[in-house]
């Protein structure tokens, strides 16, 4: 167990994971500052997995899934939660051993605990991404998803990116031996203990109320359409009208376009929580997002190719 950090707190566990993966060569970057449903949507994964340039990043990512809210009444279902993401390209041959080393650092000796890799291939329809993968079960509870990316944005991943996604709340609940996420000790310092509930319970109550009851459906439909239009404009797929004139971007801007797609996707997720989209419509919206993501992937690849894939020269 890492003696530098108190892994029996949520805060200390995150610091220990950051320190461990930094020692393995990962650059520790900060969370993406927009609403995403998973750590995979961070540009350091979703875009950097495209093309031949090597990378190694690790980061915490706050993630939002509006339909998973339970008004703060469920001990392990949240509409806002945390993932710890590790992405390395090309995926090292010993990435599973590195992962097991991180568990050992957190106090889980593989010879003393039941750690299983259960095949579970991964797919993200809106990202146009899929990969070969495994769930990692620790003493009967899923705590991590392991994925070898095969495609992102419809583009084949060459070389393959290895991704490790820790479910931080689940892992912490096991380490701390609590049955409710709200009882987790977030920090324990000179001013006393702060629990997960102290930090986030009210947020879960209020955000669940908004997601399910008060999110403005007409406004969200309008947001989706506007973000889609803006993304198409930034990808040079269609012009914008200004003062009765067509305006075109000179060069596609895949990074700002991707941010508009994430905004559209979050609007869609809120509409889903409000049950404003039928099953048939749901598939159509997913395909609209996927088409935009494909455009971003192609534009991002082209932009890096035009630069001569500078990451390959280091």
From Swiss-Prot:
Chief localisation class: cytoplasm
PROSITE patterns: AA_TRNA_LIGASE_II_GLYAB
Subcellular location: Cytoplasm
Biological processes per GO annotation: glycyl-tRNA aminoacylation
Annotated Gene Ontology cellular component terms: cytosol
EC number, UniProt record: 6.1.1.14
Keyword list, A-Z: Aminoacyl-tRNA synthetase, ATP-binding, Cytoplasm, Ligase, Nucleotide-binding, Protein biosynthesis
Alphabetical list of Gene3D superfamilies matching this protein: Bira Bifunctional Protein, Domain 2, Class II aaRS and biotin synthetases, domain 2
Enzyme class: ligase
UniProt key word DNA-binding: no
Pfam families for the chain: tRNA-synt_2e
UniProt catalytic activity: tRNA(Gly) + glycine + ATP = glycyl-tRNA(Gly) + AMP + diphosphate
Keyword Ligase belongs to the record: yes
GO molecular-function term, one example from the UniProt record: glycine-tRNA ligase activity
HAMAP family: Gly_tRNA_synth_alpha (MF_00254)
Family of the protein in this entry: Belongs to the class-II aminoacyl-tRNA synthetase family.
Oligomer status and interactors: Tetramer of two alpha and two beta subunits.
PANTHER family the record matches: GLYCINE--TRNA LIGASE, CHLOROPLASTIC_MITOCHONDRIAL 2 (PTHR30075:SF2), GLYCYL-TRNA SYNTHETASE (PTHR30075)
UniProt protein name: Glycine--tRNA ligase alpha subunit
Organism: Actinobacillus succinogenes (strain ATCC 55618 / DSM 22257 / CCUG 43843 / 130Z)
């Amino acid at each position: 167990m890492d003696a530098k950090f108190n892994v029996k707190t949520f805060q200390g566990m995150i610091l220990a994971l950051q320190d461990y993966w930094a020692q393995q060569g990962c650059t520790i970057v900060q969370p993406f500052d927009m609403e995403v449903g998973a750590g995979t949507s961070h540009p350091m994964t979703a875009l950097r997995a495209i093309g031949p340039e090597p990378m190694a990043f690790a980061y915490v990512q706050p993630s939002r899934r509006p339909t998973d809210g339970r008004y703060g009444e469920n001990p392990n279902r949240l509409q806002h939660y945390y993932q710890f993401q590790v992405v390395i390209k090309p995926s090292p041959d010993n990435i599973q051993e590195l992962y097991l080393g991180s568990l050992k650092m957190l106090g889980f000796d593989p010879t003393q605990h039941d750690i299983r890799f259960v095949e579970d291939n991964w797919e993200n329809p809106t990202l146009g991404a899929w990969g070969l993968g495994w769930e990692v079960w620790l003493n009967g509870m899923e705590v991590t998803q392991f994925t070898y990316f095969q495609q992102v944005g419809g583009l084949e991943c060459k070389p393959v990116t290895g991704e490790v996604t820790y479910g931080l709340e689940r892992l912490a609940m096991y380490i701390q031996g609590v049955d409710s996420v709200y009882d987790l000790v977030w920090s324990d310092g000179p001013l006393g203990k702060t629990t997960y509930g102290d930090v986030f319970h009210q947020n879960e109550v209020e955000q669940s109320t908004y997601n399910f009851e008060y999110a403005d459906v007409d406004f969200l439909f309008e947001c989706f359409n506007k973000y889609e239009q803006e993304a198409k404009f930034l990808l040079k797929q269609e012009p914008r009208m200004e003062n009765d004139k067509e305006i075109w971007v000179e060069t596609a801007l895949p990074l700002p376009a991707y941010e508009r797609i994430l905004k559209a996707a979050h609007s869609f997720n809120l509409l889903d929580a409000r049950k404003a989209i039928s099953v048939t419509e749901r598939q159509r919206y997913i395909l609209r997002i996927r088409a935009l993501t494909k455009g971003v992937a192609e534009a991002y690849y082209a932009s890096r190719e035009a630069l001569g894939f500078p990451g390959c020269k280091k």
